């Protein structure tokens, strides 16, 4: 990426990675925490003709219904920066890596800031409660329910209707699970099963990765689930 920036000289570049990069090390045994981000920062901040700044943003701060922190580095070409009112916030990579997060979280500068006291990110109920469970291995190409929340109404703005006047819904389909899998999923949801040992013997499998994820959390927003499609129910 750095080679590409030097060659193409874009007005702005943006690097993005997971929060774990702040404590990452090149070698698990002999490496030092934070060395990966120090090297990444050194590479981007030393590109001639650019001014760079890192930040740690949370998607929930901007109304996105999930807890998804991301480390970003933005670089602005100096001739473009001079024409703007933007001012970078300083970052000190020589300090302990344990300070990296506090140094750059919601730090403004090149990036937008959110108000920690006014976070109003929706949860899964707010976002998806207008969708029907139509049954395994099925698909409904239109909404059967009316939008209930402001977020759902926002998602349906300028929505297209079919010949019967119903709002078109795409990609709302369910996997074609076998009966014993459907039975296990239902048991897990009804009984909040999180461990293999809590399942009846006839439902236990050699590999058990499935975990029920609540649709509504005590503290918003909802966690981000990243997995193979069948790992969560």
Over which residues does each language-model region extend?
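A glycine-rich dinucleotide-binding beta-alpha-beta segment and adjacent secondary-structure elements
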Residues: 211-233
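Class I S-adenosyl-L-methionine
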Residues: 2-207, 211
């Amino acid at each position: 990426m750095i080679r590409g920036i030097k060659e193409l000289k874009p007005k702005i570049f943006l690097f993005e990675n997971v929060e774990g990069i702040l404590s990452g090390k090149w070698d698990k045994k002999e490496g030092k925490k934070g060395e990966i981000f120090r090297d990444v920062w050194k590479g981007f901040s030393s590109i001639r003709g650019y001014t760079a700044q890192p930040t740690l943003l949370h998607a929930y701060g901007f109304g996105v219904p999930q807890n998804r922190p991301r480390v970003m580095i933005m670089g602005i070409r100096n001739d473009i920066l001079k024409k703007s009112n933007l001012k970078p916030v300083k970052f000190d990579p020589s300090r302990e890596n344990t300070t990296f997060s506090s140094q750059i979280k919601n730090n403004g500068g090149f990036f937008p800031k959110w108000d920690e006291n006014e976070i109003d990110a929706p949860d899964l109920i707010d976002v998806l409660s207008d969708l029907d469970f139509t049954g395994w291995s099925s698909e409904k190409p239109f909404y059967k329910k009316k939008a209930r929340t402001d977020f759902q109404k926002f998602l349906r703005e300028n929505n297209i209707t079919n010949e019967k006047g119903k709002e078109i819904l795409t990609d709302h389909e369910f996997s074609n699970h076998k009966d014993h899998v459907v039975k296990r999923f239902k048991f897990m949801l009804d009984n909040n099963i999180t461990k293999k040992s809590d399942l009846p013997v006839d439902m236990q499998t050699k590999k058990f990765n499935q975990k029920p994820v609540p649709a509504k959390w005590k503290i918003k927003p909802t966690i981000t689930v990243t997995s193979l499609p069948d790992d969560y129910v």
